[in-house]
Each structure stands twice: as C-alpha cells, then as structure tokens.
C-alpha cells in the first residue's frame, strides 16, 4: 500500500493487530466506497438491484469469496493483468451479496474476510460490527460474542505461554453467557494437537493471575470443522495467538486478515 493510505486502509492496518481499533474500522467501512472486480451495465449507477457480474476468487482451502478493495491502487496490487471493476458503496455491495462470503483487500498483506452472518449484523438495524451468535451446546442455549477489547496483560502473558507449548496451534478469546440478561464470562478457546488437559491447566493458571479483578473465566478446546462453540470461534473470531505467526493474525495465502 502506498504512503498515502486512505482512512479505511489506515484503520484496517490498525485493526489487524489491535482489536480496540475494530469498531472505528467497521464504522468507517460502512460509510466507504469500494472497488469490486467485475462488470456492470455501462453508464448505470449501481444500486441494490443492479445487474452486476462480480468475480469470485478461490482461497487456498477451495472456498469461494467475492473480493473487494479499499482503493483502485489496492485492487491493482492484487491482480496481474488489467481488471474491470465496479465502484460502489459498501452498504450496497453487502446488501446485494447477502449470503456470500466477501474479502476486503484479498491477496494483499492486510485484509478482512466477512462471513455471511457478520455481514448481516453489520447492515442490520443494530449496526453491531462484532460477531455474535446464539448456539446450542449440549442441549443448552449459549450466546457467544467477540470481545472488543480483550485484557491486554492476560493476552500478552498467554501469548508468551503458548510460544513455549508447541502443540498449541491457535488460541481465541470471546465472551459467553446463558441469556441476554446474564453477565458474560470470558472464554478462551484453544486449538492444539494431542492431550490438552495440561495446556488448559497452565492456561487457567496464567489467565487467573493476569485477569483484572475476580472475573470468572472459562477455557475449552476447539476443533476446526466441529459444530457449536468450535464452529463459532474458529469461523468468526480472529485468533489472538497463532503458532505460525505468534500474533493476532490469520493467513490468506501467507497474508494477514482480521
């Protein structure tokens, strides 16, 4: 990206590594205009029911996403040949592609994947940019949500711990509660190889020592591909630790996303 990043690009960079910037990123995104690979009827303004042919790009895992970009320069960095594109407001793009997975600044060093559920929340009346979902686990209904500002000291200490435990692949944090009125607890989800009991015990010890106050905290194992809590955490929450990167990053062809 050039030295003259626009506001959205600047916030995207910040939000990729610091969750505190994510609410501002989402607010700015919804007010922004973006560049989308594809074609539209010549000379027509793009509205929700416009006839568009938007490109789908395939990720390394075989899943399909609709790419869109923060600027023309960003789009040009992601493609090798001349590329037709459509310029439109983000809200229009989200409304006309409901049910699809979209990827902001795909193939670039920093980007953001948007799952269908997250897009629905973003353009809903509540305008809530944080992932939230009610799930059934063991016959009980639980509400899980993204944490806007995780406890910094606890995250730092757990990251240091996990760097010393090779079986830990990724670690996540979210909030969990039984109903809308209940007080939420923090939940740490750990994806690891082999026996995880000792890892959970060590995590609990460090989390308890570094969490402000006497707030309760839950810890569980998550497995990609499983339903319930595991699905929500691995598909909707960005890891705060990842063995390959050791940070708040996931990868898309070796690039980072929120």
Swiss-Prot record:
Coiled coil: none
Superkingdom of origin: Bacteria
Function description: May be involved in the enhancement of serine-sensitivity.
Protein species of origin: Escherichia coli (strain K12)
InterPro entries named among the record's database cross-references: SseB_C, SseB_N
Name of the protein: Protein SseB
Recorded name of the encoding gene: sseB
